[in-house]
């Protein structure tokens, strides 16, 4: 990192951790958000309980003071998480993300670009993102501590999704409520050779195993401002080198990203970092390969995949990052071919933005499109979400919407069977100065 100057540029990593899988291990220089993550609320409560255990008036005073603080909105989250973060931060001042400094090469702007930045970086924009980021952080921290082998994927996914809905204060059962806040997209739980876009459909009985490598990828959103962050969980240290490689690659992408940086340069740096690692499995050494046909992406309001891609290999897009855009910096590593194909049963779907007007002959398709528009808009959804809204016998209509180009399906993406894949991801907003 270059020396600081008065004209230095900065970028906001809203997740507060540059790809670190441990939610309770803050990154250096992360004073405000990091402190909140390091000490859990339960630990703070335990610390306050000890002085109050003694006899006398002092103990009573401390007890009364503690109650007064809670009445004003004590920062205490339940387990499992169910307290809306707006109750924990009554002044709507949510923790800032980690500030990552730019190098000197990106220390200039042009007037038009600064104007676009000022248009984007309004206070509501940042506050909505910070609120969504705090929701994601608290749910992520709980998930990392409580997901264990033996749980079903449905149990894990619904636990995360219920927590996100509770913390945003939007259950999404009334028309339009999910557009105000809640899940940014379905909770992905992709295991082993499956790298992305897998969540259990109704009736799925799959159980997490001790030797599994599971990617946990979920989004939280406030007013369509989606925080898209992912981590990988393992329960056998043999997979540590794979996780270290992908985590290092994501951190590298975060450091290299910035205003006016070409996407291809970010991809080249990511690939160099990741492919310097190897992993030994059953006595055989495997190079860790970037999954070359998976990318990071920019995020628009209510749209998870914007028009820009952030490659994770060299030779990619020459497009530049712009000030005030929102990017999901994500990397995928594999012990297999480093290339994924569509496989297994589809669960993820999303309404195509500006989809063409196509006459629908099936009444089930017309009715389902109305449900999708009113409840999800262009936010991704899965079959379980339709079940949750009381929809049934919708598959024929859903497939008709897909074949008509109105809804996009997102099948699971898998490398070769027997391989292992990992993912780490965080959201970042390149900005001219720390708002």
From Swiss-Prot:
Positions of disulphide bridges:
none
UniProt-annotated binding residues for a divalent metal cation 2: 228, 297, 330, 425
The record lists the catalysed reaction(s) as: Release of N-terminal amino acids, preferentially methionine, from peptides and arylamides
Which intervals carry biased composition (Acidic residues)? 34-45
Q: Which UniProt keywords apply?
A: Aminopeptidase, Cytoplasm, Hydrolase, Metal-binding, Protease
Function, as annotated, reads: Cotranslationally removes the N-terminal methionine from nascent proteins. The N-terminal methionine is often cleaved when the second residue in the primary sequence is small and uncharged (Met-Ala-, Cys, Gly, Pro, Ser, Thr, or Val).
What protein name does the entry list? Methionine aminopeptidase 2-2
Query: Organism source for this protein?
Result: Aspergillus clavatus (strain ATCC 1007 / CBS 513.65 / DSM 816 / NCTC 3887 / NRRL 1 / QM 1276 / 107)
Question: What taxonomic classification does the UniProt entry list for its organism?
Answer: Eukaryota, Fungi, Dikarya, Ascomycota, Pezizomycotina
């Amino acid at each position: 990192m270059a020396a600081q100057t008065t004209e230095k540029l900065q970028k906001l990593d809203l997740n507060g951790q540059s790809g670190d899988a441990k939610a309770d291990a803050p990154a250096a220089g992360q004073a405000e958000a990091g402190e909140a993550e390091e000490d859990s609320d339960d630990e703070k409560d335990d610390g306050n309980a000890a002085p109050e255990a003694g006899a006398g008036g002092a103990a009573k005073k401390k007890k009364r003071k503690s109650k007064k603080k809670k009445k004003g909105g004590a920062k205490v989250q339940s387990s499992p998480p169910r307290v809306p973060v707006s109750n924990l931060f009554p002044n709507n001042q949510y923790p800032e993300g980690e500030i990552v400094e730019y190098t000197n090469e990106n220390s200039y702007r042009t007037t038009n670009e600064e104007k676009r930045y000022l248009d984007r970086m309004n206070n509501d924009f940042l506050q909505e993102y910070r609120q969504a980021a705090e929701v994601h952080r608290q749910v992520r921290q709980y998930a990392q501590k409580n997901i264990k082998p033996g749980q079903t994927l449905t149990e894990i996914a619904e636990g995360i999704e219920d927590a996100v809905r509770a913390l945003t204060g939007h259950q999404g059962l009334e028309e339009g409520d999910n557009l105000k806040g809640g899940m940014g997209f379905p909770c992905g739980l992709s295991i082993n050779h499956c790298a992305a876009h897998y969540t259990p459909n109704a009736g799925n009985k799959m159980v997490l195993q001790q030797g599994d490598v599971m990617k946990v990828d979920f989004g939280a959103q406030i007013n369509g401002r989606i925080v898209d962050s992912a981590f990988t969980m393992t329960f056998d240290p043999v997979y540590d080198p794979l996780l270290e490689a992908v985590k290092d690659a994501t951190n590298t992408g975060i450091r290299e990203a910035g205003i006016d940086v070409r996407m291809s340069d970010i991809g080249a740096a990511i690939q160099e970092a990741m492919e310097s690692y190897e992993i030994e499995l059953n006595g055989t050494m495997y190079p860790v390969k970037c999954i070359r046909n998976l990318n990071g992406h920019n995020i628009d309001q209510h749209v998870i995949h914007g028009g820009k891609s952030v490659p994770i290999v060299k030779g990619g897009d020459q497009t530049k990052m712009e000030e005030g855009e929102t990017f999901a910096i994500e990397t995928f590593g594999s012990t297999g071919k480093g290339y994924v194909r569509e496989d297994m049963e589809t669960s993820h779907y999303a309404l195509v933005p500006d989809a063409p007007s196509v006459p629908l002959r099936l009444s089930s398709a017309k009715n389902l499109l109305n449900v999708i528009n009113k409840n999800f808009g262009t936010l991704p959804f899965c079959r379980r979400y339709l079940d949750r809204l009381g929809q049934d016998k919708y598959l024929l209509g859903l497939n008709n919407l897909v074949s008509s180009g109105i809804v996009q399906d997102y099948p699971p993406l898998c490398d070769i069977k027997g391989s292992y894949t990992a993912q780490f991801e965080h959201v970042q907003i390149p900005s001219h100065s720390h708002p």
